[in-house]
């Protein structure tokens, strides 16, 4: 048995990874409850604010692969500390911004720190865990950004703003301090001799050119298949997550009711991410992937009937199940693909998220554009169901 499998300290490291991912979710969502006050203070239009909020995914697409290379060279300890530091710097820079351009670049900076944790987390888990425990570990760490986002939504206006005398800049400084403190905690945990020794086994020596690594990975059919599915999964998740409150509001709900109902998939997703990935052993992974994608497609279809509580509840539960586990199972499949492994997990993760975030950008834009053209979200929801059908055809080709 490998050293990482014997050591109970791997769970301590997993807690550190979870903390960094929590900082990711906290900072990513932090501006959403502050949009109104920031827009008023800086004199921004809704369009300008939308452009600012979309700055980091654009940078993410370009930076994911270089970040994956850096992670393979530097290792998870250094990379995840850098991630927390950049996330903290992004939050602090937002607090100092005094115009549209400054805020745009502050948010864009998050797109460099984000990939380091998104890619670094599965690489570290692939080092320290195997089999069902690896799937459980992935399910645990993916709850970090979800809970970080929930905390940002729940506490920014109810606690942080009153505590900071209503100053949104000071709130962002607070979140920057939390993120940096988390980075220091991670660095301390990852400096344990056992962690340092195991990490050294996964750091590439630079003998193989990274261009060759990229090409070798893309030659693997399972990798190409997973990348295509990742684009579809991010298209679905980002598209529906961004527009769900508005879909519910247009079905007749108040803004408060829509917010409550829209939180259901997040809560279900946390439970799903803890339970389902550990069941996705190699022999069952294809069947579970098909079931998750089918759940996503059915959820989009049921949301056509958001005015009726029964199909709405079923749709939101199914969305939460798919949202919590779909990407985790895909990432698990990728890192366990022959020819990838722990040594190239960073580079493979960089390719994965570079491809996936293309769907993440196109999803919200497409649903919004279709809504403008048709006057509603029905066509967009049908499109999501259709994409899920195509993903099922791809998932069937996954080999156990």
What are these regions (language model features)?
Residues 341-374:
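A late C-terminal transmembrane helix in Major Facilitator Superfamily
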Residues 29, 57-65, 150, 266-274, ...:
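Residue-level signature of mid-helix packing/kink "hotspots" within the transmembrane helices
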Residues 31-32, 221-263, 269-273:
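Extracytoplasmic gate region of multi-pass secondary transporters
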Residues 106-144:
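Cytoplasmic helix-loop-helix junction between adjacent transmembrane helices
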Residues 62-98:
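Conserved MFS/SLC helix-loop-helix module at the cytosolic interface between two early adjacent transmembrane helices
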Residues 284-333:
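C-terminal transmembrane helical hairpin of 12-TM major facilitator-type secondary transporters
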